[in-house]
Amino acid sequence: MDEMEVFKYQGKRFLCSGEQLPSGSFQAVVRCKLPPDDLVRTLILGAGHYMNGRQALARAKELAEEWVRTHPEDEHL
């Protein structure tokens, strides 16, 4: 089963999830709303495969934190 959570980090909001793949493993995914249209966009599709949605969700949160550190100029999230 997929796991999903709105994750706030340093004033930014992400939709983090652990999504089940056809193989049965799970992938970490990070999305957010981006201007100008506020459509939800995928920022990161994690490369790893996890045994369950909870593990993939935890990794998605880590990836969101890394994204904030590597994109300090993106204040509009």
Protein language model regions, located:
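N-terminal segment of the canonical double-stranded RNA-binding domain
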Residues: 1-29, 33-35
